[in-house]
Amino acid sequence: MISWINGELVETWQTNQKFFVLINCQGLGYEIQILESFFLKLKTNQISNKKITLWIKHIKKEDSDLLFGFTSKDQKFFFIEILSVRGVGSQIGMSILNKFSISEIIKAIKTQDKKLICSIPGIGQKMSDRLILELKSKFKSKIQIEEEKGQEEFEITNPEIYKLMEDLQLTLQSLNYKNKEIKTILPFLIKELGLPTKKEKNLSFENLLNLAMNHLDQGNSNLAR
């Protein structure tokens, strides 16, 4: 059973609404389905380091082995929780994470926002009801953590900026920066850019990523002296 992989990116491709990478790990090529957000970052060269790390959910079937890759452990285990719901398959699980962030889905489950959940491709009214019914109790503590992180630690109420910062955190994790380092850079960026109040419309993910990496690399350089 494969649970985690670190290797060199060989190729990316898209088949309908499925997004894939081929990773070379010690001479073996692993075909892995990934989320659209990470796929787009790779395709637009927003991630210069082509050696990537993914958390893997390995699903065995009679005629095939399927690998689903995520840039954080949280994404992987959220995906697993989604698959625990009756009638929800792997592609529905990927559609959910392609459409919304973890915090947005958890909030929708908590508030029983069926309209938002039904906007996800492949999910109708009955499946929306099942997702809310079967996941609401599981994510009770997780909701509190997400809300605390979004309001008290980061103080971001704008959903677009929150999603931007969440994507930044996941990307830095995939580039092998330590969680301790990442936790220090996020408040710095928020304070430096005045994100909660300015809500900058022209702020790009690439600029944020470069600023974060430069700051982290500078900090590591100072520690090495």
From Swiss-Prot:
Coiled-coil segments: none
Main localization of the protein described in the UniProt heading: cytoplasm
Cell compartments where the protein resides: Cytoplasm
Keyword Metal-binding applies: no
GO CC terms of this entry: cytoplasm; Holliday junction resolvase complex
Segments of this protein annotated with the region Domain I: 1-71
GO terms of molecular function: ATP binding; four-way junction DNA binding; four-way junction helicase activity
SUPFAM superfamilies cross-referenced by the UniProt entry: Nucleic acid-binding proteins, RuvA domain 2-like
Swiss-Prot/TrEMBL GO biological process terms: DNA recombination; DNA repair
Region (Domain II): 72-150
Keyword DNA-binding: yes
Residues covered by region (Flexible linker): 151-161
Subunit structure: Homotetramer. Forms an RuvA(8)-RuvB(12)-Holliday junction (HJ) complex. HJ DNA is sandwiched between 2 RuvA tetramers; dsDNA enters through RuvA and exits via RuvB. An RuvB hexamer assembles on each DNA strand where it exits the tetramer. Each RuvB hexamer is contacted by two RuvA subunits (via domain III) on 2 adjacent RuvB subunits; this complex drives branch migration. In the full resolvosome a probable DNA-RuvA(4)-RuvB(12)-RuvC(2) complex forms which resolves the HJ.
Function: The RuvA-RuvB-RuvC complex processes Holliday junction (HJ) DNA during genetic recombination and DNA repair, while the RuvA-RuvB complex plays an important role in the rescue of blocked DNA replication forks via replication fork reversal (RFR). RuvA specifically binds to HJ cruciform DNA, conferring on it an open structure. The RuvB hexamer acts as an ATP-dependent pump, pulling dsDNA into and through the RuvAB complex. HJ branch migration allows RuvC to scan DNA until it finds its consensus sequence, where it cleaves and resolves the cruciform DNA.
Similarity remark: Belongs to the RuvA family.
Protein name per Swiss-Prot or TrEMBL: Holliday junction branch migration complex subunit RuvA
Organism expressing this protein natively: Prochlorococcus marinus (strain MIT 9215)
